[in-house]
Amino acid sequence: DPGFSSWG
């Protein structure tokens, strides 16, 4: 999770 917490 690089920042897109909703994605992964």
Swiss-Prot record:
GO terms for cellular component: extracellular region. The keyword Coiled coil does not apply. Its main location: secreted. Keywords: Amidation, Neuropeptide, Secreted. It comes from the Eukaryota. GO terms for biological process: neuropeptide signaling pathway. The modification Glycine amide is found at G8. It is found in: Secreted. This cephalomyotropic peptide stimulates contractile activity of cockroach protodeum (hindgut). This is Leucokinin-2. It comes from Rhyparobia maderae.
